[in-house]
Design a protein with these regions (language model features):
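The feature captures the beta-strand-to-loop junction immediately N-terminal to the Walker
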Residues: 52-54
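Conserved ABC ATPase "signature" region
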Residues: 127-145
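Conserved ABC ATPase signature
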Residues: 149-153, 157
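H-loop/switch region of ABC-family ATPase nucleotide-binding domains
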Residues: 206-207
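Conserved beta-strand-loop-alpha-helix hinge in the C-terminal portion
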Residues: 226-248
Length: 251
């Protein structure tokens, strides 16, 4: 069992209008492996939070629960709405999940069609769809790419388009899995600037501790399916015992 560390009295902020509340979430895979063991987490409007920990800690499993791809035991609420089978389409429109590999997210011939896919399947009028696509591409600074072929883009460009595909749904929460993986320094810097400027509540799973240090005021550490630390990033990065215990390195 991992050591639990108390790192900050500000770890679980009290606020009105919580964007995300996870309560005592448990999940085991069909082979019996226990991936989540009582995870609780709270994000408030405007929070930008890093989720770190070793491989197998449960980070990706947790993220897949936030829009109902996986369904464990416990409660997940998005903007005050409890995730249930009946409101699953609504929750999925409220949680923008961006996978580590953008090729898992981009499957249409053109950038426009990829970004328009979600709004079209919401049944929105054509004018609203076009407006959302334009706004999403502008947010990721890819307006000039709307007619480009998605599969011809670089990895960094694909990652930005993948973010646009969920921004076009106007989500309450943006969830990203390893967004900086595989990027060269220029593309990584572009991504950091983009994430910094996006005015949206954000939970980001990453092994990039320099990214954590630069971008996220708050960090949550997971290990063996549990939240073992939750606090101010500056405090966590100075806690050498914590970092060592959970296979993390100070940037």
């Amino acid at each position: 069992m991992p050591v639990t560390h108390i790192t900050s009295q500000n770890a679980a902020p009290e606020c009105d209008g919580d964007v995300l509340v996870v309560k005592d979430l448990h999940f085991s895979y069909p082979d019996g492996h226990s991936a989540l063991n009582g995870v609780s987490l709270k994000l408030c409007d405007g929070d930008k939070v890093a989720l770190v920990g070793p491989n197998g800690a449960g980070k990706s499993t947790l993220m897949l629960h936030l829009n109902g791809i996986l369904n464990g035991h416990g409660d997940v609420e998005i903007a005050g709405k409890r995730l249930t089978r009946d409101n699953l389409p609504l929750i999925r429109s409220m949680v923008g999940l961006v996978f580590q590999n953008p090729d898992d997210q981009l499957f249409s011939p053109t950038v426009f069609e990829d970004v328009a896919f979600g709004p079209l399947h919401m049944g929105l009028p054509e004018a609203e769809v076009r407006s959302r696509v334009d706004a999403a591409l502008e947010a990721v600074r890819m307006t000039s790419y709307r007619d480009r072929l998605s599969h011809h883009l670089s990895v960094g460009e694909k990652k930005r388009i993948a973010i646009a595909t969920v921004l076009s749904m106007q989500p309450s929460l943006l969830v990203l899995d390893e967004p900086s993986a595989g990027l060269d320094p220029r593309a990584r810097r572009t991504l950091i600037n983009l994430l910094r400027d996006l005015p949206i509540t954000m939970l980001v799973s990453t092994h990039d501790m320099k990214l954590v240090q630069e971008l996220f005021p708050r960090t949550v550490v997971m290990d063996e399916g549990r939240v073992v630390a939750d606090g101010l990033t500056a405090d966590i990065l100075e806690d050498e015992a914590l970092l060592t215990a959970h296979g993390l390195e100070k940037p």
